[in-house]
Amino acid sequence: MKIGVDAGGTLIKIVQEKNGERTYSTRLTTEIEEVIQWLNQQDCNNINLTGGQAAMINEQLNCESRVFVEFDAAAKGLEILLEEQGHFLDDYIFTNVGTGTSLHFSNGKAQKRVGGIGTGGGMIQGLGYLLTGISNYKQLTDTAQNGNRDIIDLKVKHIYKDSEPPISGDLTAANFGNVLHHLDESFTDADKLASVIAVVGEVITTMSITVAREHNTKNVAYIGSSFHNNDLLKDVVKDYTVLRGCEPYYIEHGAFSGALGSIHL
């Protein structure tokens, strides 16, 4: 059995391959000691590590494992998943939305990091908690799905009420810019969280499209744990990507690209 571990800032992603079969699992980073204990029961020759805490894990193993740069591991794993899911792309941007967000260009032979932003899952959870008091990720994302952004976010259609706007009316003119126009209304937790997720999605997409244009590609693959149980984020990112003239790809098990890639490098 081969084991790939991507130890990130919030989650530890684990891929196990044996006899042509693959399993995926996650643990919280706070459970890292338990993961280390489990790894120490395995054959070190079969352990492959990547991510920000890979070096720390490696130091506590009984013997030396293989450690890879997380960007290279994610690129390799994504390449495998894209082909397995029938997407044969010559070049593409891949946007990895974890606690923060990292952007990369790949031409199928090599990857290079082309940008990064602090907007990501960490902002959804942190700002979401400050606004609502909800700390559980699933409860937070479940709640957000039913939110009404129109009373919080100012859209182009709100400005051009009686005339045709020069750009799509569905574009956001100002995130949270409609709040002071609706002080007579109650803002629910769902409304607040939907708007938080929307601003994260719009920033991620804007950055992705910008670097895609810089590298003459229209393909953008979105991966990362922040899309888990978060259809609203997926929809915002997909709609904005299409609106900007690019092709979005969501990859099943994309959050495990780093762990998978570490096995195959």
Curated annotation (Swiss-Prot):
It catalyses: (R)-pantothenate + ATP = (R)-4'-phosphopantothenate + ADP + H(+). This is Type II pantothenate kinase. Belongs to the type II pantothenate kinase family. Catalyzes the phosphorylation of pantothenate (Pan), the first step in CoA biosynthesis. Pathway: Cofactor biosynthesis; coenzyme A biosynthesis; CoA from (R)-pantothenate: step 1/5. Its EC number is 2.7.1.33. The active site is at 70 (proton acceptor). GO terms for cellular component: cytosol. It comes from Staphylococcus saprophyticus subsp. saprophyticus (strain ATCC 15305 / DSM 20229 / NCIMB 8711 / NCTC 7292 / S-41). Homodimer. The gene is coaW. InterPro entries: ATPase_NBD, Type_II_PanK, Type_II_PanK_bac. It is found in: Cytoplasm.
